[in-house]
Regions:
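Short glycine-enriched loops at secondary-structure junctions
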Residues: 28-33, 183, 230-234
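A residue-level signal for conserved active-site and pocket-lining positions in enzyme catalytic cores
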Residues: 27, 142, 270
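Rossmann-like AdoMet
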Residues: 1-84, 88-131, 135-139, 156, ...
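Generic detector of well-ordered alpha-helical packing
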Residues: 84, 111, 147-150, 231
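Conserved RecA-like P-loop NTPase ATPase core
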Residues: 58, 142, 230
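A mobile, often basic/glycine-rich helix-loop segment
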Residues: 141-192, 241-252
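A short SAM/SAH-binding and catalytic strip from SAM-dependent methyltransferases
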Residues: 137-160, 202-206, 210, 218-219, ...
Length: 350
């Protein structure tokens, strides 16, 4: 943390402030020191737990969804499933359990060395890639569960009817916010039209455009689909920057390099980028409805019938409820998919 703090302070000293996106970039991905490079963010010892580690049903029904996609495209040709991020590897492992054959290969797009180690332990045969350009040219299913929320954002606020950008500065050896003239006016104007006129605060995820573009080019060349599952909103605006440390919310500026910085996804930004690139877009739909549409409740009953243990039955119910109940992850998390312009219609988005 002290090394990251020193790097941030030095960069701020050059002109008095840095963008929130730069603060996030250094805090999360600075070589050897950034949170996503050096920390182990998952599980009880980390800062958050994702749906695949809460219930096996999550991965199993998504696995069945993926197999349906493969069958619709061409079940006999070689295919790959790539987990964007991937956590510990639980999701891909659950998907493989649904169907495993020589035609299907598995891989992770991951930069965190601790998670790469964990993924190799649970799934040694899976490949690892650091960039989409490294992934082999094959029909592909990309799955990004809580992947987009970690990319840097820019924030803007309207003060006295004038738009300002929010930056990070130093104040008595602490990081604090300040408001300055907008740094990239072209970027601001490009995205401002996507927000209501009455908005007085909005955010731009600056990496979504590149991610959607890179995945779209890959899928147009090779065929397949990309599934995104993340917390966010279809319409709306406001400050969603947050930090998690030891499973608790903390001030986003207080623990650079040792807390997980994320923001909510504006799914309208994905829709606009997808349409611009001439791709099909499905969703967004709540995680609750998506999983139920895929048969999560039916899978729960099958698993309950396979055991006589009341504790296991209760644990299965509690795990699924956590990811589908509206008061927990079911409503906040949304699901969408993008694919090339073809006749492929993925299940779950009815």
């Amino acid at each position: 943390m002290e090394k990251i703090k020193s790097i941030l302070t030095e960069e701020i000293g050059k002109k008095g402030y840095i963008s929130i996106s730069r603060f996030m970039e250094i805090s999360l991905t600075y070589p050897e020191e950034g949170y996503y490079i050096n920390q182990n963010p998952l599980g009880k010892s980390g800062d958050f737990i994702t749906a695949p580690d809460i219930t096996q049903i999550f991965g199993e029904v998504i696995g069945a969804w993926a197999i349906d996609i493969i069958n619709k495209i061409n079940a006999k040709s070689p295919f790959q499933i790539i987990d964007l991020g991937g956590g510990r590897g639980t999701l891909l492992k659950d998907i493989k359990r649904v169907r495993s054959d020589n035609n299907i290969s598995f891989g992770f797009l991951e930069i965190n060395k601790n998670l790469i180690t964990a993924q190799k332990q649970i799934f040694p045969e899976a490949k690892h890639y650091k960039n989409i350009s490294d992934i082999p040219d094959l029909p592909t299913i990309f799955i990004g569960n809580e992947f987009l929320d970690a990319f840097p954002i820019r924030q803007y606020i309207k003060i006295n009817k004038a738009w300002k950008e929010i930056f990070v500065t130093t104040d008595n050896d602490r990081f604090n916010y300040c408001y300055e003239d907008i740094e990239d006016k072209i970027l601001f104007e490009e995205h401002k039209k996507n927000f209501p006129n009455e908005a007085d605060f909005f955010e731009i995820n600056i990496m979504i455009k590149k991610i959607i573009n890179d995945i779209s080019i890959f899928l147009k060349r090779n065929n397949g689909i990309c599934l995104f599952i993340d917390y966010g909103y279809s319409k709306g605006y406001g400050n969603t920057l947050q930090a998690l440390k030891n499973h608790e919310y903390v001030d986003p500026l207080s623990f650079p390099g040792s807390s997980d910085l994320t923001s909510h996804i504006n799914f309208s930004q994905i829709i606009n980028e997808t349409k611009y690139l001439g791709m099909n877009f499905f969703g967004p739909i709540t995680q609750r409805n998506f999983l139920i549409n895929l048969g999560a409740l039916e899978r729960l009953e099958i698993l309950k019938k396979s055991t006589n243990s009341e504790k296991i039955k209760n644990d299965l119910e509690d795990g699924l409820n956590r990811v589908i109940e509206n008061s927990q992850m079911g409503e906040l998390f949304k699901v969408c998919a993008i694919s090339p312009k073809n006749k492929l219609i993925p299940e779950g988005f009815d």
